Regions:
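Helix-loop segments that flank and shape redox-cofactor active sites
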Residues: 18-44, 63-68, 115-138
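Short, helix-capping/interhelical loops that line the mouth of catalytic, cofactor-
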Residues: 1-8, 56-107, 170
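Short, glycine/alanine-rich amphipathic alpha-helical segment
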Residues: 40-42, 88-90, 143
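Individual transmembrane alpha-helices with interfacial aromatic-anchor signatures
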Residues: 135-152
Length: 170
């Protein structure tokens, strides 16, 4: 599913955020840090990952390089190899304390929400290239609303399923 208007985007973002936080509130610190999935990721690692991608959207909307928002080298980002990008994000946050990850997750989402709030439907339908005209890529890219939705609502829902299954199976 996707959205096509700000009137659809804002409640979808809120619902996905609240649902993910309800799931997180059920977990102990030990569950968030010690339990690992098949790839070795903990709940904390999933949250650091979500934070990095949400921050990349924040940077995108500000016209700043997304690789800087992700915290990965430009060449890694430009490779478009999501596994390599995600591995770089993981390595960057592996030793970060849970409290810091949670604080950054909440702060990044609040900053992103504050940046999206004043945007109009016209702003949200401007293509990727409007926000990052110098980033290489084919054509104009997707509309901003798709970038925002994909890296918040869709991404939160995707990782919430993984987090829930990780905790249930342990």
């Amino acid at each position: 599913m996707s959205v096509s208007t700000k009137a659809e985007l804002m409640p979808a973002m809120e619902q996905a955020w609240l649902a993910l936080n309800r799931e997180l509130n059920l977990l102990s610190e030990a569950q968030m840090v010690q339990q690992k999935d098949a790839t070795g990721w903990s709940v904390k690692d999933h949250l650091a990952h979500l934070t990095a991608w949400a921050r990349s959207v924040l940077f995108f909307l500000q016209g700043r390089d997304r690789h800087a928002g992700l915290g990965v080298p430009e060449m890694v980002y430009l490779s478009e190899d999501e596994d390599q990008i995600n591995a770089a994000i993981y390595a960057q946050h592996i030793d970060q304390p849970l409290a810091d990850v949670l604080q950054q997750f909440r702060a990044t989402y609040a900053q992103l929400l504050a940046l999206v709030e004043p945007l109009t439907d016209d702003d949200l339908h401007k293509p990727y290239s409007h926000y990052l005209p110098n980033e290489p890529g084919d054509g104009d890219g997707p509309p901003a609303i798709n970038v925002i939705y994909g890296n918040t609502v869709h991404h939160f829902q995707e990782h919430m399923r993984w987090i829930a299954s990780l905790v249930v199976t342990e």
